[in-house]
């Protein structure tokens, strides 16, 4: 299943996906963050309408999508790894939960590619690690695929050649995966209860 096709969007409909796990787990001092409730509302609407509203996109986001194949090619050159593209992979035990890695690497790995604005890319080089939302995304991908590591790639072709490409390997963290799975399971239970409540009120 090719990503960003009608089939792929249909497979994701109403499901918690890896790229939004940070929203599910977002908290403030007083409890859950607004982004969690907003994401739940979005999924409830998807499940009840069978449709997905078009998500906001801008030139920077489109540029990131367009650059992804170039970043993947650079990774293959740098590492010599074989990358197989894939579609949505459902979680093996949690229904309504899945991930779409940017590629399967060999027998045990994954790749996650980001093509951000230049300063974000440079910040990643400086800190040597991805943002927490990306760590959650990659651990979710490993939970869904059973893979053991994920190479995180940040790429910006506007910079000098020796600064365009950054790669670091993120190992599977079973403790964090257990936390993610617990949070997502609770979120999905709340979502399903809310749908049932809405159906009763409408009857």
Give the label of every model feature segment.
Residues 1-66, 201-203:
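Charged, glycine-rich intrinsically disordered N-terminal tails and low-complexity linkers that flank
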Residues 15, 27, 114, 126-131, ...:
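Context-gated lysine
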Residues 30-31, 70-74, 153-158:
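Intrinsically disordered, low-complexity boundary segments flanking structured domains
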Residues 41, 72, 138:
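Generic structural marker for isolated residues within well-ordered, non-membrane alpha-helices
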Residues 53-56, 70, 111-114:
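Extended, charge-rich alpha-helical segments
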Residues 61-83:
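Acidic-basic catalytic patches of nuclease active cores, encompassing PD-(D/E)XK
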Residues 79-101, 105-188, 192-194:
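Nucleic-acid nuclease catalytic cores
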Residues 191-203:
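Charged, low-complexity C-terminal accessory regions
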